[in-house]
From Swiss-Prot:
<keyword id="KW-0963">Cytoplasm</keyword>
<keyword id="KW-0206">Cytoskeleton</keyword>
<dbReference type="InterPro" id="IPR042541">
    <property type="entry name" value="BART_sf"/>
</dbReference>
<comment type="similarity">
    <text>Belongs to the ARL2BP family.</text>
</comment>
<dbReference type="InterPro" id="IPR023379">
    <property type="entry name" value="BART_dom"/>
</dbReference>
<keyword id="KW-0496">Mitochondrion</keyword>
<keyword id="KW-0966">Cell projection</keyword>
<dbReference type="Pfam" id="PF11527">
    <property type="entry name" value="ARL2_Bind_BART"/>
</dbReference>
<dbReference type="GO" id="GO:0036064">
    <property type="term" value="C:ciliary basal body"/>
</dbReference>
<comment type="function">
    <text>Together with ARL2, plays a role in the nuclear translocation, retention and transcriptional activity of STAT3. May play a role as an effector of ARL2.</text>
</comment>
<dbReference type="InterPro" id="IPR038849">
    <property type="entry name" value="ARL2BP"/>
</dbReference>
<dbReference type="GO" id="GO:0005829">
    <property type="term" value="C:cytosol"/>
</dbReference>
<dbReference type="GO" id="GO:0030496">
    <property type="term" value="C:midbody"/>
</dbReference>
<keyword id="KW-0969">Cilium</keyword>
<dbReference type="GO" id="GO:0005654">
    <property type="term" value="C:nucleoplasm"/>
</dbReference>
<keyword id="KW-0539">Nucleus</keyword>
<dbReference type="GO" id="GO:0051457">
    <property type="term" value="P:maintenance of protein location in nucleus"/>
</dbReference>
Length: 163
């Protein structure tokens, strides 16, 4: 069986709902990577990141920010998906997502999780605040540069070629 036959054979076993799910995830990746979405999310986070503190206690002020985020970002994504996939249903997709969560790229799933999981939402803001305040992950102290060339103990001026 050649590669084309194998691919065709595999496709015949995937259901229409799987293909639809894959199409939505592909569109989601495009939307999330788009400059317009990145700007929308960055502006929202710039507006509120200083409200969030890395403590166990969750302030009452977090709730309206969370609700505003859901309204703004989820609405934007849903509108974009409706433009690209006529008849798209966010509620149905969310249900399907729970069954396919292991198949979705981590960054997409994490972003979608910020709509329903408050702790994921708060963590996103804490990470953003740490980055803005220069407290991001610093790997420089763990890096060591080693020359792959063996250095000679003889200075270059004394290293004459002799015939």
């Amino acid at each position: 069986m050649d590669a084309l036959e194998e691919e065709s054979f595999a496709l015949s076993f995937s259901s229409a709902s799987d293909a639809e799910f894959d199409a939505v995830v592909g569109c989601l990746e495009d939307i999330i990577m788009d400059d317009e979405f990145q700007l929308l999310q960055r502006n929202f986070m710039d507006k509120y990141y200083q409200e969030f503190e890395d403590t166990e206690e969750n302030k009452l002020t977090y709730t309206p920010i969370f609700n505003e985020y859901i309204s703004l970002v989820e609405k934007y994504i849903e509108e974009q998906l409706l433009e690209r996939i006529p008849g798209f249903n966010m509620a149905a997709f969310t249900t399907t997502l729970q069954h396919h969560k292991d198949e979705v790229a981590g960054d997409i799933f994490d972003m979608l999780l910020t709509f329903t999981d408050f702790l994921a939402f708060k963590e996103m803001f804490l990470d953003y605040r740490a980055e803005k305040e220069g407290r991001g992950l610093d790997l420089s102290s763990g890096l060591v540069v080693t020359s792959l060339c063996k250095s000679s103990s003889t200075p270059a001026s004394q290293n004459n070629l002799r015939h």
